[in-house]
């Protein structure tokens, strides 16, 4: 589908519609149904009524994503730069993590700027940009997202970072499955992981499944660490019995180190400890099995599965 290419300034002159109550949800819904013009009207109406707010910037990031996914890289880069500039201006008066909208907006702006650079053959510039952003925002909630995008460009073919609290069996290939208790896509991988384990664990594959705490339990209810830890175990027993063994390894450091801001994130490490696959998001059985089979078949760890 061809996306509408509109500069940011034109968002001020599109015919207004009543300002929506949940601009992010409304804009996402409009894009999901192909109603690009409607999404732009919603953004315009919200800005006219509320001004440029963190919620507006997050909603606008969905327009930016749409341009990127349609390979309209010039527009995506311009929009992302605008979101970045507005976000960093707000940071002069407030911390990033005071509420959720600004981190999501800024994280998207960084992700899309790096993505447009890489997509246009400017990979080294993308890596440098992400390294700079990692240094700038290293003490904030968006660091894992920045690292995810950096690792997408750099991790495959490199030694696997160590895992906090987990020892990878030496000389064995390993499948690392980063999951979250709230994650529906993680649960959708259960049948796939069950088949992968049944076939390849007897052939020497190690299966590791770290997670982390998020500060809440079912329904988004705030939870103390001990309560959430117990809830994680409850989810494991309910959904992942036979796939994820107890005790579950819980560590925020692992998620930051591997940039696992997307769950699931799937990492495949060969016998020599080299990352051969780094995949934020769910995978099909066929794709995952093919990657694992190639690593298993290589006895010396020189397989080049997915290596960039």
Where are these regions (language model features)?
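N-proximal helix/coil linker or "cap" segments that precede and/or mark the start of modular domains
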Residues: 118-164, 226
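Flexible helix-coil transition and linker loops at the boundaries of alpha-helical arrays
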Residues: 47-56, 86-103
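Thiol/disulfide oxidoreductase modules built on the thioredoxin-like
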Residues: 239-293
């Amino acid at each position: 589908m061809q996306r509408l290419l509109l500069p940011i300034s034109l968002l001020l002159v599109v015919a207004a519609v009543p300002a929506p109550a949940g601009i992010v949800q409304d804009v996402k819904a409009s894009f999901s149904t192909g109603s690009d013009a409607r999404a732009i009207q919603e953004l315009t109406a919200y800005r006219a009524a509320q001004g440029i707010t963190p919620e507006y910037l997050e909603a606008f990031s969905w327009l930016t994503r749409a341009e990127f996914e349609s390979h309209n890289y010039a527009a995506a880069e311009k929009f992302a730069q605008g979101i970045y500039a507005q976000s960093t201006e707000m940071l002069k008066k407030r911390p990033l993590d005071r509420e959720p909208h600004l981190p999501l907006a800024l994280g998207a702006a960084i992700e899309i700027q790096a993505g447009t650079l890489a997509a246009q053959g400017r990979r080294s510039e993308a890596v440098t940009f992400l390294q700079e952003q990692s240094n700038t925002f290293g003490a904030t909630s968006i660091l894992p997202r920045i690292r995810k995008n950096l690792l997408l460009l750099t991790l495959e073919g490199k030694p696997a970072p160590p895992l906090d609290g987990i020892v990878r069996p030496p000389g064995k290939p390993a499948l690392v499955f980063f999951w979250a208790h709230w994650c529906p896509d993680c649960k959708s991988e259960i049948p796939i992981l069950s088949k992968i384990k049944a076939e390849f664990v007897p052939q020497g594959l190690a299966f590791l499944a770290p997670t982390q705490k998020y500060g809440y339990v079912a329904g988004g209810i705030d939870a103390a660490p001990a309560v959430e830890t117990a809830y994680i175990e409850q989810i494991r027993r309910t959904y992942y019995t036979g796939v994820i063994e107890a005790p579950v390894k819980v560590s925020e450091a692992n998620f930051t180190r591997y940039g696992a801001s997307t769950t699931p994130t799937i990492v495949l490490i060969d016998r020599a400890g080299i990352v051969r696959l780094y995949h934020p998001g769910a995978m099909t059985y066929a794709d995952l099995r093919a990657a694992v089979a190639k690593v298993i078949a290589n006895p010396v760890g020189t397989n080049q599965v997915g290596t960039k």
